[in-house]
Amino acid sequence: MRMLDDAALLRGGELVTYNEITQVLRSMVIVVDDREKDTPLLHQRLTSFPCAFMRKRLDFGDYTAEVTLPNGEKFSLADKVVVERKYDLTEICGNFTTNRIRFAKEFDRAAAAGAKTYILIENGSWEKIHKGAYRSKMTPASLLGSLTTWLARYNCQIIFCESTSTSWLIHAFLLHEMREALTHYEMPQKPKRTRKSAEEDIIK
């Protein structure tokens, strides 16, 4: 596959311009895992996205995105880039203690697919971890050790934010990841229409 710069992607042997990529990005839909609990906070988050959203079962992660390509096909980041959202440090402590095996298996599935995961932790910071400013028996050293182990073991990034920033951050991550993915994506070529096939269509 040819590697292209930000100005173009390959479509059936033809270069697609930056403007055409921008047009495809306008069709972007954020996909939300249907296991995200249906709460007023979730509803507020979803309706704050500057694009459409839909709920669907994901193999890993809580959020990803898909677009409609010029040939009408869907292109998804579900096996490439996802966002894993945590409400606070207390929730991530639960993932690293009570639910550690299940949590690790989810990241193992992402790793097997070659996917990148953004771990978005609301209402937290490295400083709060250091001070133990959360509700859990997990020590600051253990929590720090688990988070840095995940960084070393998996293709992931840990981002801290306020809960009011979650919607636009998820959208920003997925929008620019989608742009990068499209830049290096080669669309399937449509079969060339020959005189014979045209004549056969007329007969039909």
State where each predicted segment sits.
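Conserved catalytic cores of phosphodiester-cleaving nucleases, focusing on short active-site segments
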Residues: 81-87
